[in-house]
């Protein structure tokens, strides 16, 4: 009897010690870069990515506006077509003074340093689910645009003023019942004489340009970075900084004209906290060679990225049913891919096309009465132009990859999955469509039944065949070259001011 009790106590003690034992980090489990190529294990790795930005909310409890069963269904769908990476938001900000329009709700950060644990648990669940399917994750830590709160909310906090000069954004109550864009506000223009932006871009840019508040905005931002990276997943028990499911920490979604000193300070800070993860900027690459190389030049930035938006930038008209506009879009995309390939080769870093998209055949919805008596972005429109554009773009990137010309993956915007524009919004007014709250729902969505997904799947297959053809046979032990990693100092200050 005494022996049995002793054995039971010993077993309990061992169980407690095992549960308290820190998670063992194996650097070989992380995606890394060697000779300007992504690697996973012993092989080159091509990113078949997908933008799926709202998953920390989608995977949250129903009471927090989530839909976990939908999320799990969609992750399974993504895996089935060969997606091996997703880009998501790991940040969203509320005003702390009531609900602001055009953004994600509930927010992860309700006010500086105050977090909604339900949304954090949604992020925990998302990482665990992606891990089951061997899907790696790009964690975006901030946003120049307002649909997640982002820079403008940091500026609002720092100035103690909730009046944000929003640009034209989607108003679901306009043109009932279809919705329309607001007409007030401005995205802003660049004033060459003052060397500053006007409108919303100028306001949001104060996040890292206004020296009267950057000690606050950057301080809060670095606190957020530290909180997220050091978080221990409530489901897996693994700290985010030790989780190989996370491939990359991305500084921000589409920072406009970011100071090099801000990029360097922030990326080095991330590296000091999560040395096994990659870091990138989230830059579009639309402003030319000088900006592209400058933004991606710091040693603490592992790879470059590009965002390609032919309609938003005036190179495609979704109401044109002829080939003229589509050909124009392809010609612009050709030059964009060529330029970023050359610039990335110059700085010896891989590049990923982490955002691009095209609308459905909207001329069909106009014929049905849009925008007055039919929804312009209705899912009933076909995707003939979109499919041709995706086929052209993805095959081009795969060809660059095959020839060692820097491009190493694509990430369409964005996965809407089983959602459709006719679905009702949740109790928080959110659709969790592929399009964020400030844009027309359904504009750039990829639905689970779209033929476009077959093109994404073909890309995955073609890239895999290239890797098989160029990789040595077998999987020899120790095939990975040891990484020479710089140790970045953990700086709590703001040195870029």
Q: What does each model-identified segment do?
A:
Residues 467-478:
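Core catalytic subdomain of AMP-forming adenylate-forming
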Residues 14-22, 476-497:
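Low-complexity, Pro/Ser/Thr-rich intrinsically disordered segments
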């Amino acid at each position: 009897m005494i022996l049995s009790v002793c054995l039971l106590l010993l077993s309990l003690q061992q169980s407690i010690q095992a549960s308290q034992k820190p998670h063992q980090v194996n650097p070989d489990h992380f995606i890394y870069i060697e000779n300007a190529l992504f690697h996973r294990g012993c092989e080159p790795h091509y990113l078949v990515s997908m933008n799926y930005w709202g998953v920390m909310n989608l995977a949250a409890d129903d009471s927090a506006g989530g839909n976990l069963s939908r999320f799990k269904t969609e992750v399974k769908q993504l895996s089935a077509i060969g997606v091996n990476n997703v880009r998501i938001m790991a940040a969203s900000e509320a005003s702390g003074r009531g609900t602001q329009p055009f953004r994600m709700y509930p927010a992860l950060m309700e006010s500086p340093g105050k977090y909604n644990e339900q949304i954090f648990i949604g992020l925990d669940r998302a990482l665990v689910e992606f891990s089951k399917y061997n899907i790696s994750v790009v964690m975006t830590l901030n946003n120049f645009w307002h649909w997640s709160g982002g820079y403008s909310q940091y500026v609002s906090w720092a100035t103690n003023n909730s009046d944000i000069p929003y640009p034209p954004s989607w108003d679901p109550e306009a043109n009932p019942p279809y919705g329309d864009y607001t007409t007030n506000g401005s995205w802003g223009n660049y004033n060459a004489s003052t060397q500053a932006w006007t409108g919303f871009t100028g306001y949001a840019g104060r996040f890292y340009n206004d020296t009267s508040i950057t000690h606050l905005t950057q301080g809060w931002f670095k606190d957020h970075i530290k909180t997220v990276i050091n978080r221990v997943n409530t489901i897996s028990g693994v700290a985010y900084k030790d989780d190989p499911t996370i491939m990359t920490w991305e500084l921000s979604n589409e920072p406009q004209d970011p100071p090099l000193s801000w990029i360097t300070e922030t990326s080095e800070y991330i590296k000091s906290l999560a040395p096994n993860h990659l870091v990138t900027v989230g830059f579009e690459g639309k402003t030319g060679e000088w900006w592209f190389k400058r933004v991606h030049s710091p040693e603490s930035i592992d790879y470059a990225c590009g965002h390609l938006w032919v309609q938003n930038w005036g190179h495609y008209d979704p109401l044109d049913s002829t080939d003229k506009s589509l050909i124009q879009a392809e010609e612009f995309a050709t030059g964009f891919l060529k330029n970023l390939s050359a610039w990335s080769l110059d700085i010896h870093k891989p590049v990923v096309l982490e955002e691009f998209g095209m609308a459905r055949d909207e001329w069909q919805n106009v014929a049905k009465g849009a925008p007055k008596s039919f929804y312009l972005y209705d899912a009933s429109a076909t995707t003939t132009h979109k499919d041709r554009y995706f086929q052209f773009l993805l095959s081009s990137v795969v060809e660059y990859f095959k020839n060692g010309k820097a491009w190493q993956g694509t990430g369409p915007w964005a996965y809407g999955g089983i959602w459709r524009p006719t679905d009702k919004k949740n109790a928080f007014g959110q659709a969790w469509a592929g399009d964020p709250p400030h844009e027309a729902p359904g504009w750039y969505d990829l639905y689970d039944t779209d033929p476009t997904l077959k093109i994404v799947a073909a890309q995955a297959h073609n890239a895999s065949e290239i890797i098989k053809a160029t990789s040595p046979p077998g999987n020899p032990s120790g095939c990975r070259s040891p990484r020479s990693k710089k140790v970045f100092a953990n700086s709590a200050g703001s040195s870029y001011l």
